[in-house]
A protein has these predicted regions:
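Active-site neighborhood of phospho(di)ester-bond hydrolases with catalytic His/Asp-centered motifs
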Residues: 1-4, 25
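Extracellular S/T/G-rich loop segment that most often corresponds to the catalytic His/Ser-adjacent loop
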Residues: 17-98, 102, 135-136
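Extracytoplasmic/secreted cell-surface and envelope-processing proteins
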Residues: 8-12, 34-35, 69, 121-122
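Residue-level detector of functionally special positions within alpha-helical transmembrane segments
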Residues: 4, 81-83, 127, 132
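C-terminal subdomain of the subtilisin-like protease fold in secreted/lumenal serine endopeptidases
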Residues: 98-138
């Protein structure tokens, strides 16, 4: 689930990301610019821990300046936010499960954490770090 865009203060992860049962994804790159003008405030990604002291988000992924779908004629537009970061992790996990089909979800989650670029100084606020897809699927 996406962490939400209400950061950077602690305890700003939104529902459903606060649930113990979901993997919550934050955006690693918080500044968004359009024609040189900042359009999203610095630190928009929701941060943990939750009110129950759960580390959230667990993992970070790129979420700024992502080409996505649009209702316009072109069919595409550039978007930013944790909702753009979450599909990066979903896709990476799909590749990893394809390579390691015998892994349980818990085993894959641990592999994801162990192979992330660490940012341990802020573990409770931003999780285990930035996703490293290459290391995840090796």
């Amino acid at each position: 689930a996406a962490a939400g865009n209400n950061g950077p203060k602690e305890n700003t992860v939104t529902i459903p990301g606060i649930s113990r049962k979901v993997l919550t994804v934050g955006s690693s790159d918080d500044d968004t610019y359009d024609r040189g003008r900042k359009v999203l405030k610095t630190g928009y990604s929701g941060r943990g821990p939750t009110a129950c002291c759960i580390v959230k988000p667990e993992i970070l992924a790129p979420g700024t300046g992502i080409t996505s779908c649009s209702k316009d004629k072109s069919g595409y537009q550039v978007k930013s936010g944790t909702s753009m970061a979450a599909p990066v992790v979903s896709g990476a996990l799909a590749l990893a499960f394809e390579k390691y089909p015998s892994f349980t979800p818990a085993e894959m989650k641990l592999r994801l954490y162990e192979r992330a670029y660490p940012r341990s100084a802020q573990l409770g606020r931003i999780g285990w770090g930035m996703i490293h897809v290459d290391h995840l699927v090796r």
